[in-house]
Amino acid sequence: MAGVKALVALSFSGAIGLTFLMLGCALEDYGVYWPLFVLIFHAISPIPHFIAKRVTYDSDATSSACRELAYFFTTGIVVSAFGFPVILARVAVIKWGACGLVLAGNAVIFLTIQGFFLIFGRGDDFSWEQW
């Protein structure tokens, strides 16, 4: 039952993050949908982790070159997701208020993704690996 509560909490926080992102795009003062391109960064951020988990066999090792490279790529993706709305606001494509809402949405969504892997990445009975 604890896994179901965690899944509901993660889906709720993901919905809050997407709400911030949509507010940054759809409010009448902002009205520009360029910040929706950060959804691409949200979708591809777990891919390096999936690849490293599939390729790396020794999960008890303290360090693995493949895992470190996956962390590096994931960090680059997350930094790009936070930098993209700032660049759009800097060149006056979007307003700074929309940038703030998109950055808040990014923070909530990436914390939700991290929480998902912390909760369901343990390999216990209620794990994301079984889905």
UniProtKB/Swiss-Prot annotation:
Q: Where are the transmembrane segments?
A: 7-27, 32-52, 69-89, 100-120
Expressed in which tissues: Expressed at the highest levels in heart and placenta and at a lesser extent in lung, liver, skeletal muscle, kidney and pancreas.
Q: What is its main location?
A: Golgi
Q: Does the keyword Transmembrane apply?
A: yes
* One Pfam family here: Vps55
User: One GO cellular component from the entry?
Assistant: endosome
Q: Which GO terms describe its biological process?
A: late endosome to vacuole transport via multivesicular body sorting pathway; negative regulation of growth hormone receptor signaling pathway; negative regulation of protein localization to cell surface; negative regulation of receptor signaling pathway via JAK-STAT; positive regulation of protein targeting to mitochondrion
Indicate how the chain sits in the lipid bilayer. Answer: Multi-pass membrane protein
Identify the InterPro entries for this entry.
Vps55/LEPROT
Quote the subcellular location field of this record: Golgi apparatus membrane; Endosome membrane
Origin: domain of life: Eukaryota
Q: Print the keywords alphabetically.
A: Endosome, Golgi apparatus, Membrane, Transmembrane, Transmembrane helix
Sample GO molecular function, one term: signaling receptor binding
Share what the entry says about its subunit structure, partners included. Answer: Interacts with LEPR. Interacts with RAB13.
Q: Which family does it belong to?
A: Belongs to the OB-RGRP/VPS55 family.
The entry's function note states: Negatively regulates leptin receptor (LEPR) cell surface expression, and thus decreases response to leptin. Negatively regulates growth hormone (GH) receptor cell surface expression in liver. May play a role in liver resistance to GH during periods of reduced nutrient availability.
Q: What is this protein called?
A: Leptin receptor gene-related protein
Species of origin reads Homo sapiens
- What gene name does this entry carry? LEPROT
